[in-house]
From Swiss-Prot:
Domain of life: Eukaryota
Annotated localization: Cytoplasm
GO (cellular component) term, any one: neuronal cell body
Residues involved in a fatty acid binding: R127, C128, Y129
Gene giving rise to this polypeptide: Fabp7
Main location: cytoplasm
Residues in coiled coil: none
The protein's name: Fatty acid-binding protein, brain
Record-level GO BP terms: cell proliferation in forebrain; neurogenesis; prepulse inhibition; startle response
Length: 132
């Protein structure tokens, strides 16, 4: 089912992302850049692993992992996390844990778009991507 996510995606809409970044402790200047940047996300499968590349003018990141297996990740805002990504039905759920905290990133395909819901505590941000 990961195949449905394998594509190049361009951000088209973002809601409440500044509040989400603020809750994570991201500084003002970085949040300003994050709010205007429209990243491209490339999801693929390579050698039995899922690869998610995020490209933007601010910073490029890449994670590769096997579904359901914990891996070390440095987030785009430089948090050192222990992460797990799993497939739950038609949703790709990415959980990051660091310093006793946890955030969830749920990716799902709706009407040909990738909808990404970011949750940290009671703060929810939604970012929508279309195929590039």
């Amino acid at each position: 089912m990961v195949d449905a996510f394998c594509a190049t995606w361009k951000l088209t809409d973002s809601q409440n992302f500044d509040e989400y970044m603020k809750a994570l402790g991201v500084g003002f200047a970085t949040r300003q850049v994050g709010n205007v940047t429209k990243p491209t996300v490339i999801i693929s499968q390579e050698g039995g692993k899922v690869v998610i590349r995020t490209q933007c003018t601010f910073k490029n990141t890449e994670i590769n992992f096997q579904l359901g297996e914990e891996f070390e990740e440095t987030s785009i805002d430089d948090r050192n996390c222990k992460s797990v990504v799993r497939l739950d039905g038609d949703k790709l759920i990415h959980v990051q844990k660091w310093d006793g905290k946890e955030t969830n990133c749920t990716r799902e395909i709706k009407d040909g778009k990738m909808v990404v819901t970011l949750t940290f505590g009671d703060i929810v941000a939604v970012r929508c991507y279309e195929k590039a």
